[in-house]
Amino acid sequence: MEGPPPSKRPCGLPPGVRLVVPAAAASASNAATAAAAAAPAGAGAGASKPARPPAAARPAKGTPAASAATTATGADASAPAPDPGAPTWDAFAAEFDVAPSWRALLEPEIAKPYARLLLAEYRGRCLTEEVLPAREDVFAWTRLTAPEDVKVVIIGQDPYHGPGQAHGLAFSVRRGVPIPPSLANIFAAVRATYPTLPAPAHGCLEAWARRGVLLLNTTLTVRRGVPGSHAPLGWARLVRAVVQRLCETRPKLVFMLWGAHAQKACAPDPRRHKVLTFSHPSPLARTPFRTCPHFGEANAYLVQTGRAPVDWSVD
């Protein structure tokens, strides 16, 4: 075997003596040299990516570590962002003077995008037209009847559109305002069942509301002089959702659904509630409302289910 080149020959080795390198050492030296030569080429390319850690070193999907890593890198865009325009309950309740007892039924709806658009459109209408009832009366029904006190639900369509009439209760008008024809027919039906009740001197139904009668229109506002003008705003969707939650939380309610509109707008489960239907109390209805037996039927059901009947007087 040849010895090392003269430049590499160990100092002091006599001439003619050959240096023998063990095979194992030579192999190790050659491998190290090859690795050293390859390293600069790989590092200098600039296009190679660092090696991905083995699977055992990576956090499994769905674990807290994986979630934290995803959040840190901003890669998870699947979670919907909260609606920045949704009103808080406190702001909504303050704007409309909503009773806190209705929070559990109303708050889930006002947080939805459609409700934000509805309220924005309502506020815009208030800037350009006379809207009835007054803002503080739109949710007056919440202040007069708490959910836990509801016995009877009467569904109307939209508020009266004449000046001074609407005040937040379906079919009701303020004291001192002439009794509308529809309400006169309602009073006639009550007296047909309870002839000893005194004839009402006014059309304000707040006494009914305080006794557990929820008087709720499907559309809560209207432009003065233009019936049905605010139906496109979307109040009906909110009202339906609130009534549905009421049906789910309060058993054995009595529903009085007068006319096709009310019967389509509200569909309580007849196995869980007493559902009464009749024509609308308008004088234009085909069937005279004065013959409607609902007021007596409602009280009979309330007594049958262990509750006090409703006093249908208005004073």
Swiss-Prot record:
Active site: 158
Gene: UL2
UniProt-annotated location(s): Host nucleus
Organism of provenance: Suid herpesvirus 1 (strain Indiana-Funkhauser / Becker) (SuHV-1)
Stored PROSITE patterns: U_DNA_GLYCOSYLASE
Region annotated Disordered, chain positions: 35-88
EC numbers, comma separated: 3.2.2.27
An annotated GO BP: base-excision repair, AP site formation via deaminated base removal
Reaction(s) the record says it catalyses: Hydrolyzes single-stranded DNA or mismatched double-stranded DNA and polynucleotides, releasing free uracil
Keywords: DNA damage, DNA repair, Host nucleus, Hydrolase
InterPro entries: UDG_fam1, Ura-DNA_Glyclase_AS, Uracil-DNA_glycosylase-like, Uracil-DNA_glycosylase-like_sf
Protein name stated in the entry: Uracil-DNA glycosylase
Function noted in UniProt: Excises uracil residues from the DNA which can arise as a result of misincorporation of dUMP residues by DNA polymerase or deamination of cytosines. Therefore may reduce deleterious uracil incorporation into the viral genome, particularly in terminally differentiated cells which lack DNA repair enzymes.
Keyword DNA damage in record: yes
A molecular function GO annotation: uracil DNA N-glycosylase activity
DNA repair keyword on record: yes
UniProt similarity note: Belongs to the uracil-DNA glycosylase (UDG) superfamily. UNG family.
HAMAP family attached to this UniProt entry: UDG
PANTHER family referenced in this protein's UniProt entry, alphabetically: URACIL-DNA GLYCOSYLASE
GO cellular component: host cell nucleus
Domain of life: Viruses
Low complexity bias locations: 35-80
